[in-house]
């Protein structure tokens, strides 16, 4: 059974609190991204590409038979791939209501809001808008 969103968020905050400096936190983020599976080539097309990201990001959402929203995404940039890993860990496999009612504030709590470049912040914002938009319209892609 999947952990609750609150447990996932608290575990992420705790994981990042173990690191004393941002070099170690970035390395952890990169390591998380490396563990993500590659999305199928059928989704590596312009129609699934996020706008607003400097790096290439493909983002897909599917609604399961159990009314859960499954997200898949990948980037060609290591840190962005790590950000994707965090987003998917919290939001993928959740109901629309869970997604809507869960703010991405945990990213601020681990300090990402002050340690990302402006272009990465824009990309993170684009991902946040995308999963919220897809959830709101309950799109099956």
Would you name each region that the model predicts?
Residues 47-53, 71-75, 97-99:
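Solvent-exposed interaction patches of small proteins and small membrane subunits
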Residues 58:
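A glycine-rich, hydrophobic loop/mini-helix early in the fold
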Residues 93-110:
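Glycine-rich phosphate/pyrophosphate-binding loops
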Residues 62-77, 88-92:
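Conserved interaction-surface patches within small, structured recognition/assembly domains
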Residues 124-134:
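Long, amphipathic alpha-helical surface segments
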Residues 133-141:
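Single conserved hydrophobic/aromatic residue that forms the stacking wall/gate
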Residues 2-5, 9, 19-27, 31-54, ...:
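N-terminal intrinsically disordered, cationic/polar leader segments
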Residues 84:
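Primarily the active-site beta-strand->alpha-helix module of PP2C/PPM metal-dependent phosphatases
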């Amino acid at each position: 059974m999947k952990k609750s969103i609150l447990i996932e968020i608290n575990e992420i905050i705790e994981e990042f609190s173990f690191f004393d400096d941002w070099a170690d936190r970035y390395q952890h983020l990169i390591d998380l991204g490396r563990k993500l599976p590659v999305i199928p080539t059928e989704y590596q097309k312009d129609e699934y590409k996020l706008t607003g990201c400097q790096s290439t990001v493909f983002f897909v959402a599917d609604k399961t038979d159990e009314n859960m929203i499954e997200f898949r995404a990948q980037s060609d940039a290591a840190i962005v791939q790590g950000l994707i890993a965090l987003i998917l860990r919290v939001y993928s496999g959740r109901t629309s209501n869970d997604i809507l009612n869960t703010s991405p504030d945990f990213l601020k709590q681990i300090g990402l809001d002050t340690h990302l470049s402006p272009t990465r912040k824009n990309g993170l914002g684009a991902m946040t808008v995308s999963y919220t938009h897809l959830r709101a319209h309950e799109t099956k892609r």
